[in-house]
Amino acid sequence: MPSISTNIILAFTAALTGMLVFRSHLMSSLLCLEGMMLSMFILSTLTIMNLHSTMSFMMPILLLVFAACEAAIGLALLVMMSNTYGLDLIQNLSLLQC
């Protein structure tokens, strides 16, 4: 496996670990999620370029579209939470609070 792919997989793993460790704040979770999406985009682009697969050239673009939608929804949720509660704690999102 080339070193570039290994580094990108390591970046994805680090972002996933960050998502699991820093899950109390929404901003940290969104940043880790963006890191995961970026590493998936780069890895899929490199894989398609190495395999010379012409049928799946649109897959990285589709992944970027989903990442942009996820970022927009996440930022809207973050602004709504900070205006309502003054915090970005994920526990404020629970509907089962007493």
From Swiss-Prot:
Q: Which GO terms describe its cellular component?
A: mitochondrial inner membrane; respiratory chain complex I
Record keywords: Transport included? Answer: yes
Q: Which UniProt keywords apply?
A: Electron transport, Membrane, Mitochondrion, Mitochondrion inner membrane, NAD, Respiratory chain, Translocase, Transmembrane, Transmembrane helix, Transport, Ubiquinone
| Known outcome of mutating S94N | In strain: Isolate NARA4.20
What is the E.C. number?
A: 7.1.1.2
The identity of this protein, by name, is: NADH-ubiquinone oxidoreductase chain 4L
Q: What topology does it adopt in the membrane? A: Multi-pass membrane protein
Family according to the record = Belongs to the complex I subunit 4L family.
Cellular compartment(s): Mitochondrion inner membrane
Catalytic reactions on record: a ubiquinone + NADH + 5 H(+)(in) = a ubiquinol + NAD(+) + 4 H(+)(out)
The UniProt transmembrane annotation reads 2-22, 29-49, 61-81
Query: Looking at the record's lineage, which domain of life comes first?
Result: Eukaryota
Which PANTHER family does this chain map to?
Answer: NADH-UBIQUINONE OXIDOREDUCTASE CHAIN 4L, NADH-UBIQUINONE OXIDOREDUCTASE SUBUNIT ND4L
Biological function: Core subunit of the mitochondrial membrane respiratory chain NADH dehydrogenase (Complex I) which catalyzes electron transfer from NADH through the respiratory chain, using ubiquinone as an electron acceptor. Part of the enzyme membrane arm which is embedded in the lipid bilayer and involved in proton translocation.
A single GO molecular function term of this UniProt record: NADH dehydrogenase (ubiquinone) activity
Q: Which GO terms describe its biological process?
A: ATP synthesis coupled electron transport
Q: What class of enzyme is it?
A: translocase
Q: How does it assemble?
A: Core subunit of respiratory chain NADH dehydrogenase (Complex I) which is composed of 45 different subunits.
Q: Which gene encodes it?
A: MT-ND4L
Transmembrane helix as UniProt keyword:
yes
